[in-house]
Amino acid sequence: MTEQNNPAESNTAAAVPAQDDNKIIAERREKLAEIRQQGVAFPNDFRPTHHAGDLQAKYRELEQTALEAEPVQVAIAGRMMLKRVMGKASFATVQDATDRIQFYISRDAVGEDVYASFKKWDLGDIVAARGTLMKTKTGELSVAVTELRLLSKSLRPLPGDYYGLADQEQKYRQRYVDLIVSKETRDTFRARTKAMASLRNFMAGNGFMEVETPMLHPIPGGAAAKPFITHHNALDMQMFLRIAPELYLKRLIVGGFERVYEINRNFRNEGVSPRHNPEFTMMEFYAAYTDYRWLMDFTEQLIRQAAIDASGTATLTYQGRELDLAKPFHRLTICQAIQKYAPQYTDAQLADVDFLRAELKKFKIDTNAPQFLNAGVGTLQLVLFEETAESQLWEPTFIIDYPVEVSPLARGSDTLPGITERFELFITGREIANGFSELNDPEDQAERFRKQVEQKDAGDEEAMFYDADYIRALEYGMPPTGGCGIGIDRLVMLLTDSPNIRDVILFPHLRRED
């Protein structure tokens, strides 16, 4: 069920007089007090039989004669968004979860007492009606009401601006109001739900089992990020909100589940930006007996199908530019990408640590920071890529063959020393996915963990901890495996043409209100 565009209806709430909100609230509280005196103020005995969206889809094009020939009885409820009071008959536009529909309210049909009460009702009130479908003289599908009830009194006025909430932060802070008045916002989150359902259907169709792994970790792992720290009182131990589920999911591969995935929250105690929220949704999946090449093909198909299911097409428009997910995704190495968008760099320069350090200073990069203390050519190449090429990757592009020093959990290449079988997928200049052939050599993994600990001891807060239990799991033997993580929020941004990650998170984190 989806909302239909109706030229006879506003896309948001009707404007309310520019009065002081406190005065309006006081007046509405007085009305509520009167209602309480008359009986149950918030009844819960009305059950709708229809939704506005279904009625609009099925009956909007019918003529009045057809509706008279076969009367359609309905019971429907929703929020009153428009109200036009006249003499013996009035109109109200009511919005439910699917669309809007007009009520035609005649004093003779509902009775004088109910009609008098209706005149006092306010925009935002939750109302219910029983009646028969009809067409007005202007051809608008309406409910000729025979029974009218107030189910919930709205004490606060809806935004007075015709276009809803004008302040962007207020939209995020009071998402419940934004959802009431903005069809665009409602459509965004419906698309998100469709995308999530598509991902799950695709995974199930390819033999993956959905699992749930811990949100509280004794050791943070699976990504280079700063964790949130908490304390478990019963166990009297420090714990961390998970930054990634990776190491637990790979333990399941060790245990014999050959294809697993999880869609859930990750938490990273880092900055907020149009692309970053400290609490975000990820999908990670792992498949035994696959590698990063298989993963790239699979991820491409997965994202393409999600676009079709959520948007109806794989050819999208994002921020005014076409984005074609139907075409094969590009594949470039880090150095190839740098030289494509910054062709002044030679192969020799990109292999020269001293040159790269000097070049990065031109981009205001502090190469004396802790994370660069023992940085090799791979780390420096990656930073140069981020500065010169990343934002240019508008079309879907897999950046492949990452250096081992920035890929502590990825399997090394059998043919390219110092390189791993890893990729990151970029679309519209943003990272959408990260995947690789998994490192299943326990001794190699232990050594990489030790190097991460050295970086952490040197001051790199995002370096990984040593996870002895994960090493123990690998020592039981993990089959060759490929694994990938997809940022759901960023994917939904693409599918809904949303410029800010907060636009696709129902309740994003904000600073406290003053």
Swiss-Prot record:
Signal peptide: none annotated. Mg(2+) 2 binds at E431. Its EC number is 6.1.1.6. InterPro entries: Aa-tRNA-synt_II (IPR004364), aa-tRNA-synth_II (IPR006195), aa-tRNA-synth_II/BPL/LPL (IPR045864), Lys-tRNA-ligase_II (IPR002313), Lys-tRNA-ligase_II_N (IPR044136), Lys-tRNA-synth_II_C (IPR018149), NA-bd_OB-fold (IPR012340), NA-bd_OB_tRNA (IPR004365). Its cofactor is Mg(2+). It is found in: Cytoplasm. It comes from the Bacteria. Homodimer. Belongs to the class-II aminoacyl-tRNA synthetase family. This is Lysine--tRNA ligase. It comes from Ralstonia pickettii (strain 12J).
